[in-house]
């Protein structure tokens, strides 16, 4: 008998089953507090998963965001997708999560599927240093271009001084 508790088995929801039926390897993470299905996707399968979901009607990227799991742990890029249609009171939603190592934080850009990813991916890059490969204009959006580091990482050390330049 093991002293470590076993993780509960989480059954795939409707979106997870759809992706599995398309031979896309994903892991169900259950549902969030709002009841939205959450799915973990490897970064090398992200574009195939997103193209499948777009073809299935998930036509709106409500939010792309990122967070830091903690010092020495993974960075996470998240995608909240919705099927928008006429007269939908509660449209289907899903949240995709891609976990990447902080020493190699690369994820394919979904800009070419949902244009709303443009500034959202840039913000995640600017704050966490996640590189969205294939993004047409991946550069800082909030911090000065010469800023060193990624301010929302939990291991970020704030500089004592930063000299602002005069605007002309």
Curated annotation (Swiss-Prot):
It is an enzyme of class 7 (translocase). Gene3D superfamilies: NADH:ubiquinone oxidoreductase, 30kDa subunit. One of its GO terms (cellular component) is plasma membrane-derived thylakoid membrane. GO terms for biological process: photosynthesis, light reaction. It catalyses: a plastoquinone + NADH + (n+1) H(+)(in) = a plastoquinol + NAD(+) + n H(+)(out); a plastoquinone + NADPH + (n+1) H(+)(in) = a plastoquinol + NADP(+) + n H(+)(out). GO terms for molecular function: NADH dehydrogenase (ubiquinone) activity; quinone binding. It is a peripheral membrane protein. Keywords: Membrane, NAD, NADP, Plastoquinone, Quinone, Thylakoid, Translocase, Transport. Its main location: membrane. It is found in: Cellular thylakoid membrane. Its EC number is 7.1.1.-. InterPro entries: NADH_DH_suC (IPR010218), NADH_quin_OxRdtase_su_C/D-like (IPR037232), NADH_UbQ_OxRdtase_30kDa_su (IPR001268), NADH_UbQ_OxRdtase_CS (IPR020396). Belongs to the complex I 30 kDa subunit family. NDH-1 shuttles electrons from an unknown electron donor, via FMN and iron-sulfur (Fe-S) centers, to quinones in the respiratory and/or the photosynthetic chain. The immediate electron acceptor for the enzyme in this species is believed to be plastoquinone. Couples the redox reaction to proton translocation, and thus conserves the redox energy in a proton gradient. Cyanobacterial NDH-1 also plays a role in inorganic carbon-concentration. NDH-1 can be composed of about 15 different subunits; different subcomplexes with different compositions have been identified which probably have different functions. This is NAD(P)H-quinone oxidoreductase subunit J. The lineage of its organism: Bacteria, Bacillati, Cyanobacteriota, Cyanophyceae, Acaryochloridales. The gene is ndhJ.
């Amino acid at each position: 008998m093991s002293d470590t508790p076993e993780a509960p088995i989480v059954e795939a929801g409707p979106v997870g089953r759809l992706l599995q039926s398309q031979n896309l390897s994903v892991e169900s993470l259950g549902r969030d507090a709002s009841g939205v299905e959450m799915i973990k996707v490897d970064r090398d399968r992200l574009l195939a998963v997103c193209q499948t979901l777009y073809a299935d009607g998930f036509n709106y990227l409500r939010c792309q965001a990122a967070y830091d799991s903690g010092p020495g742990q993974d960075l996470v890029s998240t995608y909240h997708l919705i099927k928008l249609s006429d007269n939908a009171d509660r449209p289907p939603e899903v949240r995709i999560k891609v976990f990447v190592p902080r020493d190699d934080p690369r994820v394919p850009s979904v800009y070419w599927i949902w244009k709303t990813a443009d500034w959202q991916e840039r913000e995640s890059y600017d704050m966490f240093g996640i590189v969205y490969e294939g993004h047409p204009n991946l550069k800082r959006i909030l911090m000065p271009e010469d800023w060193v580091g990624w301010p929302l990482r939990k291991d970020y050390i704030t500089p004592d001084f930063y000299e602002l330049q005069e605007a002309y």
